[in-house]
């Protein structure tokens, strides 16, 4: 009796820790993979060259697939116009975007940076992502497929649209409550949220989330929205610094995806054309409408959000004017603006813009 009562626990405890971690990660990645399928059968058949007629990622019959968000059935309407026209980026400006990091200088910065690292850990876990050290990109465990990149993009963009909406909403209510102007912050924050949503809609034209991905997004968005809402009430400066650090991670993610594409690790994307929604939104010119061009545009947007939020984090939240929504006295000098011509990785300091 005694030997039997102790044998079971000993055998369970003898399972190596690394095996348990591998099992959890493998299960998470397989479930997340099952939660994402390509939503355009003709495009997938063309670009993924599946002679058997099966899609690259899916368990759903092709006959059941339809446009994930088809245009509304309104015969009298040609197109829905947006209030925020996207600025035109040049290819030179987009290629000049680099990975960067703003050093934490005070307790507020450290709280923001620590929170981003925690969020990054959770996102890496659910999307199966491992960031390689320099020179380790060719190691198999660090390699990402097109399917895995899309899964990460969809999850990332579904969460990235939350901060701008929360910040804009709270500042809008504050302006109404105090009966004072907001000095241009609301428009920029709402435009940021809209831009992140357009990223998501673009990637959803390429892959349709399944039930598991929807569940992950629902949980992450619910927790993140409420957490960010409360945090913004306590310290808006910390929240903007948090978003600045989060966008640093986004720039890093898209930079690595671009490098993988350029090095031939993502062959199915080499000749893939950007969805029509992306062509119209970014005003992509003829001859520059490939998947690589799309990633360059998205990365440039993330770099702009990085600059904007690091800059807003440097300002006095209650009194300073938003420098990205003003007309400058001397336009010949470099100033913050909607474009990326004078992009600053770590944001503009308060002395430079006030």
Swiss-Prot record:
Membrane topology: Multi-pass membrane protein
Binding site for Fe cation 2: 196, 247, 302, 305
Pfam families attached to this UniProt entry: AOX (PF01786)
Chief location bin: mitochondrion
Chain residue ranges for the region called Disordered: 333-354
Keywords, ordered alphabetically: Electron transport, Iron, Membrane, Metal-binding, Mitochondrion, Mitochondrion inner membrane, Oxidoreductase, Respiratory chain, Transit peptide, Transmembrane, Transmembrane helix, Transport
GO biological process: alternative respiration
Lineage top rank: taxon: Eukaryota
Transmembrane portions of the chain: 153-173, 215-235
Cofactor-binding details, from the entry: Binds 2 iron ions per subunit.
One annotated GO molecular function: metal ion binding
Binding sites annotated in the UniProt record for Fe cation 1: 157, 196, 199, 302
Cofactor: Fe cation
GO cellular component, one term: mitochondrial inner membrane
Targeting signal (transit peptide) range: 1-64
Compositional bias ranges of the Basic residues kind: 335-344
Subcellular location: Mitochondrion inner membrane
Enzyme class at the top of the EC tree: oxidoreductase
EC numbers on record: 1.-.-.-
Family label: Belongs to the alternative oxidase family.
Cited function: Catalyzes cyanide-resistant oxygen consumption. May increase respiration when the cytochrome respiratory pathway is restricted, or in response to low temperatures.
Descriptive protein name: Alternative oxidase, mitochondrial
Organism: Emericella nidulans (strain FGSC A4 / ATCC 38163 / CBS 112.46 / NRRL 194 / M139)
GN (gene name): alxA
């Amino acid at each position: 009796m005694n030997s039997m009562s102790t044998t079971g626990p000993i055998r369970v405890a003898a399972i190596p820790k690394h095996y348990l971690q591998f099992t959890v990660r493998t299960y998470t990645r397989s479930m997340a993979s099952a939660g994402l399928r390509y939503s355009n059968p003709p495009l997938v058949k063309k670009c993924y060259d599946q002679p058997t007629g099966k899609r690259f990622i899916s368990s759903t019959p092709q006959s059941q697939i339809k446009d994930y968000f088809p245009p509304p059935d309104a015969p009298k309407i040609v197109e829905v116009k947006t209030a925020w026209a996207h600025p035109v980026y040049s290819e030179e400006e987009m290629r000049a975007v680099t990975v960067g990091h703003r050093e934490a200088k005070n307790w507020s910065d450290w709280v923001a940076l620590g929170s981003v690292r925690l969020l990054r850990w959770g996102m890496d876990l659910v999307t199966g992502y491992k960031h390689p050290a320099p020179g380790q990109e060719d190691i198999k465990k660090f390699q990402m497929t097109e399917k895995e990149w899309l899964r990460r993009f969809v999850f990332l963009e579904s969460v990235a649209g939350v901060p701008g909406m929360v910040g804009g909403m709270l500042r809008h209510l504050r302006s109404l409550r105090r009966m004072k102007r907001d000095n241009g912050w609301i428009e920029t924050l709402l435009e940021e949220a809209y831009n992140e949503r357009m990223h998501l809609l673009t990637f959803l034209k390429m892959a349709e989330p399944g039930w598991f991905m929807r569940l992950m997004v629902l949980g992450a968005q619910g927790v993140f929205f409420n957490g960010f809402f409360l945090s913004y009430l306590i310290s808006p400066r910390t929240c903007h610094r948090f978003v600045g650090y989060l966008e640093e991670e986004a720039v890093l993610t898209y930079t690595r995806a671009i490098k993988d594409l350029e090095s031939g690790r993502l062959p199915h994307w080499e000749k893939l054309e950007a969805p029509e929604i992306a062509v119209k939104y970014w005003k992509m010119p003829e001859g520059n409408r490939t998947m690589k061009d799309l990633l360059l545009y998205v990365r440039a947007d993330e770099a702009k959000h990085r600059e904007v939020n690091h800059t807003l984090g440097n300002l006095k939240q209650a009194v300073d004017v938003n420098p990205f929504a003003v007309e400058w006295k001397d336009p010949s000098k470099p100033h913050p603006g909607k474009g990326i011509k004078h992009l600053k990785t770590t944001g503009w300091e308060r002395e430079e813009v006030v």
